[in-house]
Amino acid sequence: NRYIKGEERSFTIVAYPVPEIGERYREIFDDVIRINTLDAGLYERVQQTIIDALDRGVYVRVKGKGANQTDLKIQLHELNDPEKETIFENCVADVNIPVGEVFTSPVLSGTEGVLHVSRVYLNELQYIDLKLTFADGKITDYTCANFEKEEENRKYIYDNVLHNHETLPLGEFAIGTNTTAYVTGKKYQIEDKMPILIAEKTGPHFAVGDTCYSWSEDIKVYNPNGKEIIARDNEISLLRKEDPAKAYFQCHTDITIPYEEIGRA
């Protein structure tokens, strides 16, 4: 845009409940106020500690526990100058409110395994035992248990998660840190009504589709500590330099695994 330059503007999004959420609207509203006004400075420091550890890694392995079959390896970008660069963005309510996540764009090559969640709501649709299989960072198989017939399960995912694409890449890996939001959802049993701005902060989550930096990968972004976030591209988004039609999917769907379904790698 000639007149409104992307590198010179930003935005902020926040969500609040409406009375239709139920009889406990006032209580829920007060708790959402609390979620949306948590101490950003505190979360910045806590999340920076997490990022400092992740920046020393080559990959992250996420495993489910109990009935959760998740076993996913997420390949990380390599830092050329750790003193000035970082892999993860420290998200502390300067754009998306509330506070509570660190996220990155994974390297697709080497990202592989199974993502499974027993129940999740995506764009107001429920998925039971959603399972996605990845190889080289792209979906190779998928299923759920919403319907008796497997072809109906696959069509449900194809229509509403893959958005009619044969495959999608893992565009984002994030760790949600907002335990206050997690407890609130459980307390009022409103996990299905939580907007993605809040829901994505309640556990580790994975987005299939475009990265968080789509169409703005060349704009340098920095964490509060001054380090440049270098993980803004993956092997598919880099195709924009030759053919933008091959680089973007026009979708980005966050899938959150609840804390109670996560084990130790």
Write out the residue ranges for each language-model feature.
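Short solvent-exposed loop/turn micro-motifs enriched in small/polar/acidic residues
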Residues: 55, 123-126, 166, 199
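Active-site lining segments that contact anionic ligands and/or coordinate catalytic metals
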Residues: 110-112, 127-129, 136, 168-172, ...
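Conserved small/polar residues in nucleotide/adenosyl-binding loops
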Residues: 265
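A hydrophobic, small-residue-rich beta->alpha segment in the mid-to-C-terminal subdomain
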Residues: 202, 217-254
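Long, well-ordered mid-to-C-terminal structural blocks that present hydrophobic/aromatic surfaces
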Residues: 105-164
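Dual-mode signal for accessory low-complexity, basic/Gly-rich regions
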Residues: 141-217, 244
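Active-site bordering "gate/hinge" segments
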Residues: 1-110
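Generic beta-strand/beta-sheet core signal
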Residues: 14, 63-65, 77, 118, ...
